[in-house]
Amino acid sequence: MKYADIDRIYRNVPLDRIPWNNETPPDQLVELVETGKIQPCRAIDLGCGAGNYAIYLAVHGFDVTGVDSSPAAITIAAENARKHNVICRFITADLLGDLHEIPGRFGFAFDWELLHHIFPEDREKYVQNVSKILTSGAWYLSMCFAETDPQFGGTGKFRTTPIGTTLYFSSESELRELFSPLFIIHDLQTIEVGGRFGSHRAVYVLSRRR
């Protein structure tokens, strides 16, 4: 992940042109929350961007912290929360670092369209960090683009997007191997997800910390 590239995008590209900036929370998150499968608790949005999903959780009773590597994104997220009259904490942090900026532990973590920005050599460290900030039995929801996704050329594990980012496209087996040592997987499947500029094929993983 190139943090400077992400920050540059938030500083220079209008929010409605950033592909992953969707104001409406994903159906999969909404279902977990509104059916009560995930109960209000301390929650953390990893790679929160403009804070849209963190705000959704706060409206539904969660005590939410949003984290992003981009200071510009965090500034936007804080202003977004003020506009919606909700309380969220937003923190700039390196999710591959020691996470000293993030206080306490959480009962729910999620990253939506973050993991494909993290390349294989850094993923084990990232998942260890997620485990470190969760309580035992906490839920963890992750979604990243699948290697079968037809977008951005439709082939290859590494693909460059029109906005200039390079993403890594995963298989179900890769993610099962990545998460299983630290998490009990409850659901892992390839799904279709909507996007600002078209739908994507993605791998959805719902798990609990061991």
Model-derived features: where do they sit?
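Class I (Rossmann-like) S-adenosyl-L-methionine-dependent methyltransferase catalytic domain
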Residues: M1-I44, A50-I102, I118-N129, W139-R210
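A conserved beta-strand element that flanks and buttresses the S-adenosyl-L-methionine
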Residues: F110
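Short catalytic micro-motifs in class I SAM-dependent methyltransferases
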Residues: E113-H117
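Short, conserved loop/helix-junction motifs that constitute active-site signature segments
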Residues: K132
